[in-house]
UniProtKB/Swiss-Prot annotation:
4-imidazolone-5-propanoate binds at R75, Y138, H171, Q239, T316. GO terms for biological process: L-histidine catabolic process; L-histidine catabolic process to glutamate and formamide; L-histidine catabolic process to glutamate and formate. Keywords: Cytoplasm, Histidine metabolism, Hydrolase, Iron, Metal-binding, Zinc. The gene is hutI. This is Imidazolonepropionase. Fe(3+) binds at H66, H68, H236, D311. The keyword Iron applies. It comes from the Bacteria. Belongs to the metallo-dependent hydrolases superfamily. HutI family. It comes from Pseudomonas aeruginosa (strain ATCC 15692 / DSM 22644 / CIP 104116 / JCM 14847 / LMG 12228 / 1C / PRS 101 / PAO1). InterPro entries: Amidohydro-rel, HutI, Metal-dep_hydrolase_composite, Metal_Hydrolase. N-formimidoyl-L-glutamate binds at Y138, N313, G315. Zn(2+) binds at H66, H68, H236, D311.
Length: 402
């Protein structure tokens, strides 16, 4: 069934630029974009429905390409402790930090995790997110990682959004493997990944390469295991120190390397040559009061596509707004509004391996788009909050109206 969407303007994001079409029209056929361009050039057609968008601006549906949205409990108490001067190390030594989230996640039922994640994700979806990634990594044993990944798959079946599932078993060392990191990595590679991938629960594999997590050599073992299973890889890298994890990610043609505050010029060059996307996470940078900025100019010099994500998680980025991350990326990292919009559309799609079907308004791609109550695209990075979407459309069907 063909529908005509008209009386609008469009920022198509073709090629990662605004690529603006004034006085635009868009034709959908089933779930796909059939035609888009200036309304004056609209070819004759027989449309089952004509939708007047009232002068709204259209963009591709937003994509949140890095979240940890499934977890048990929350850590608002630790937030208060940090503000009172208690260090993260002291909190962790008392059983807090990621260990507390692991305990709460292991104890929670699948239904409890599903309900809490849906509640967290609702604000993102209402604000224009039509695709997202969710990572495991708070289970850290086979049964609990399976539980998390099952919840992620169920969210994909129930939410009006495309949901990609990433196995992050190599997120932290579980307590039962204290002092035995190599043994845990072996368990991930020989037991967890084959089992979880065999059950169809995994779209990609991630790891955390950092002094407080896993070494580049240990991460490489995970990458090799993922490659043997035919799974793409991603990496948390260079958030707190420089271990050149982003270069390792590039060597394995990773979909993305994320955080990147401490990456070097050589790391950026390697990522550019490999086509690995840099996923910037300003929410975590802000909440941790970091001062080391990711090297944006180096990423630009080497042609590295920059995506932006919420990093929604209970410890370092309890962010329920992807649009707020656009403002933070402009204000804290000095990206342009155009770069940030590309970062939550086309480049975010690339970071999930979805660029053939998502991320820009082009013929043949899925008709996932948002009609915004704005006067120019830069407003999406300008306004802090507010109910800006007039309509959120997924697969040519309205899923939210403002």
């Amino acid at each position: 069934m063909k529908r005509l969407w008209q009386h609008c303007h469009a920022a198509t994001l073709k090629g990662g630029k605004y690529s603006i079409v004034e006085d635009a029209a868009l034709v959908t056929d089933g779930p796909l974009i059939h035609w888009i361009g200036p309304r004056a050039e609209l070819p004759p057609g027989d449309y089952a429905e004509r939708i007047d968008l009232g002068g709204a601006w259209l963009t591709p549906g937003l994509i949140d390409c890095h979240t940890h949205a499934v977890f048990g409990g929350n850590r608002s108490g630790e937030f208060e402790q940090r503000l009172e001067g208690v260090s993260y190390a002291e909190i962790a030594a008392a059983g807090g930090g990621i260990a507390s989230t692991v305990r709460a996640t292991r104890e929670a039922s699948e239904e409890e995790l599903l309900a809490s994640a849906r509640k967290r994700l609702e604000p993102l979806l209402r604000d224009g997110v039509t695709a997202l990634e969710i990572k495991s990594g708070y289970g850290l044993d086979l049964a609990s990682e399976r539980k998390m990944l099952r919840v992620i798959r169920r969210l994909g079946e129930r939410l009006p959004a495309t949901v990609r599932s990433t196995c992050l078993a190599a997120h932290a060392l579980p307590p039962e493997y204290a002092g035995r990191a190599d043994d845990y990595i072996e368990h991930i590679c020989s037991t967890m990944l084959p089992a979880l991938a065999g059950e169809g629960l995994v779209d990609a594999v991630d790891a955390f390469c950092e002094h407080l997590a896993f070494s580049p050599a240990q991460v490489e073992r995970v990458f090799i295991a993922a490659r043997e299973l035919g799974l793409p890889v991603k990496l948390h890298a260079e958030q707190l120190s420089s271990l050149h994890g982003s270069s390792l990610a590039a060597r394995y043609r990773a979909l993305s390397a994320d955080h990147l505050e401490y990456m070097t010029e050589d790391d950026a060059r390697a990522m550019g040559e490999a086509g690995t996307v840099a996923v910037l996470l300003p929410g975590a940078f802000y909440l941790l009061r970091e001062t080391q900025l990711p090297p944006i100019d180096a990423l630009r010099r080497h042609g590295v596509a920059m995506a932006i994500a919420s990093d929604l998680n209970p410890g370092t980025s309890p962010a329920l707004s992807l649009r707020l991350m656009l403002n933070m990326a402009c204000t804290l990292f000095r990206l342009t509004p155009e770069e940030t919009l590309a970062g939550v559309t086309l480049h975010a799609a690339r970071a999930l391996g979805l660029e053939a079907s998502h991320g820009s308004l082009e013929v043949g791609k899925l008709a996932d788009f948002v009609a915004w109550d704005i006067e120019r695209p830069a407003e999406l990075a300008y306004w802090l909050g507010g109910d800006l979407p007039k309509r959120v459309i997924r697969h040519a069907e309205e899923v939210y109206r403002g």
